A protein has these predicted regions:
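Short helix-initiation/N-cap motifs at beta->coil->alpha
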Residues: 28-34, 89-97, 218-227
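Basic- and aromatic-lined ligand-binding clefts that recognize polyanionic substrates
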Residues: 45-57, 157-214, 222
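Extracytoplasmic substrate-binding proteins
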Residues: 119-189, 276, 285-309
Length: 309
């Protein structure tokens, strides 16, 4: 009995000695340049200013370490962001710096909207800023999950979290093969075209619709390029995918995307006549949480419900 206890004690001591104090990961700096970032290994106090990162942390079972979080309307993160003892750190666009400092985090996760605050936040704790679409949505989400898991010694748990995603995308690809589309977001009464390099790029990049709205001369990565409805008529896509930004950010008094899109011009298109205008059912997920595992599942569900039923 005594020898068994000694062995357990020795094993525990060895594990503690072999665990590193820090780990080096690939991340982005405030200029969106790739850097090697040293962060504490297995940090106990996490500040969340990015919902995709929170999504991955929850999938890894680390939500109990969150000491502060930005607010969010996403239903699946409410158990964390509104939990007792979790400080409100502002929003994913504007952080409450005093609140972040007060919660004494060991590590801070941010998204692109806070890249301008990277240096200020880095004075509080190491800031992990990960890309969301550089490698394609699925590949980048998987890569980010691997990165986050490596910080906490949970690398072995990642593969199981992505089971089934490849097959689902292949099914959608079979449907999309040879079909044309325009992808865009509705905001402030207008329609902005999105390319294959940012938001909603999974539709053209991985699912495989030919995105006829892509134009190398314009920046389509963030809010897209404002397009006239004549542009849609001219391009004559078979499908039109619409993300309602105003609904995503809960803009008061904004018109619904359907009211804006279904006008005299758009109603002349085959996409409208054939019932192929797809309004993405969970715009807040597409707009604020792309890059998370649950978010990816919901995004695929939105496409499957419209295209495969």
């Amino acid at each position: 009995m005594l020898s068994a206890l000694c062995l357990l004690t020795a094993a525990s001591a060895f594990a503690q000695e072999s665990a590193p104090e820090t780990v080096v990961i690939q991340a982005l700096d405030g200029n969106r340049e790739s850097i090697e970032l040293t962060v504490p290994y297995d940090p106990q106090r996490i500040a969340i200013l990015d919902m995709a990162s929170l999504d991955i942390l929850m999938a890894l079972g680390l939500e109990d370490r969150v000491v502060g979080s930005a607010s969010s309307s996403l239903e699946y993160v409410q158990s964390v962001v509104t939990a007792e003892g979790v400080a409100n750190l502002g929003t994913i666009k504007t952080a409450d710096m005093e609140a972040v400092m007060a919660c004494e985090p060991d590590i801070i996760f941010i998204g692109g909207r806070l890249s301008g605050s990277y240096d200020t936040l880095s004075e509080i704790a190491p800031v992990v800023y990960l890309p969301t679409t550089d490698e394609g949505t699925l590949a980048q989400t998987r890569l980010n999950a691997d990165t986050i898991a490596s910080i906490f010694g949970k690398e072995a748990e990642v593969a199981a979290l992505f089971e089934g995603f490849d097959a689902r995308i292949e099914t959608l690809k079979s449907f999309a093969d040879g079909k044309t589309a325009i992808v865009g977001l509705v905001t402030s009464g207008g329609f902005n075209v999105l390319g294959n390099d940012g938001r909603c790029s999974i539709i053209g990049r991985e699912v495989g619709f030919t995105n006829v709205g892509v134009d190398a001369e314009i920046d389509t990565a963030t809010h897209g390029n404002e397009a006239s409805f004549e542009f849609i008529v001219e391009k004559a896509p078979e499908y039109i995918f619409v993300m309602d930004r105003d609904a995503a950010i809960q803009t008061e008094g904004a018109k619904l995307a359907q009211e804006i899109m279904e006008n005299e011009l758009v109603m002349t298109t085959d996409a409208y006549k054939n019932g192929n205008i797809v309004y993405l059912a969970h715009p807040a997920v597409w707009y604020t949480a792309e890059g998370g595992i649950t978010a990816l599942d919901i995004m695929l569900q939105d496409l499957e419900a419209e295209l495969l039923q």
